Amino acid sequence: MKPIQKLSLFRLLPLSCVLLLTACTLTQPGGTGSADSPQWRAHTQQLQQLNQYQTRGSFAYLSNEKKVYARFFWQQYHPERYRLLLTNPLGSTELELIVQPNMTQLTDSQGKKYFSDNPEEIIYQFTNMDIPLDNLRHWITGLPGDAKNFKLDANYLLKTVNYQQNGATWQVNYQSYDTSTTPALPNRLELIQGDRRIKLKMDNWTTK
């Protein structure tokens, strides 16, 4: 694998991009649904049948050490294969990640390609961002992934997820859903681990 250089162009992204993350959306209702309910089981079955989908929107990674704002495009074209694209406000590609079983390809803004068998490791080495990609691909659709500790809202949709990974606890907060899609899909969520926060706002979804 080629030596990996730290990505620096993200530092140039303006703070104003965070405004894209605060657009008006329908917030979640209060209350807690049961994870044993037929409504939740039916919803998870619908989500698990989404083998192909794509979404785009705003991405923010905030920590004491760095602040990154970008646009993202996520394309899932198989249960175990996906493509993640991060672009700057001018639309230029900063990073492309293509993930499939036992193979991850990362392409930087100069078109150089790097390979690994671990997507979380290669994106951390390249950007110094700790992103739980293995579970994020489930969380982004509203599934708990490997987490066993989660709560539902009154509509039997995920409200919070708590997941431990390598001694660290990630908390996922679902702030709103797009109910115009079938099944309903998240359009705002936040991941928190220590001083790290990852914010995602999905502008739209395309499903098959």
UniProtKB/Swiss-Prot annotation:
The keyword Cell cycle does not apply. It comes from Photorhabdus laumondii subsp. laumondii (strain DSM 15139 / CIP 105565 / TT01). Monomer. SUPFAM superfamilies: Prokaryotic lipoproteins and lipoprotein localization factors (SSF89392). It is found in: Cell outer membrane. The gene is lolB. GO terms for biological process: lipoprotein localization to outer membrane; protein transport. Keywords: Cell outer membrane, Chaperone, Lipoprotein, Membrane, Palmitate, Protein transport, Signal, Transport. One of its GO terms (cellular component) is cell outer membrane. A lipid is attached at residue 24 (S-diacylglycerol cysteine). Gene3D superfamilies: Lipoprotein localisation LolA/LolB/LppX. A lipid is attached at residue 24 (N-palmitoyl cysteine). The lineage of its organism: Bacteria, Pseudomonadati, Pseudomonadota, Gammaproteobacteria, Enterobacterales. Residues 1-23 form the signal peptide. This is Outer-membrane lipoprotein LolB. It is a lipid-anchor.
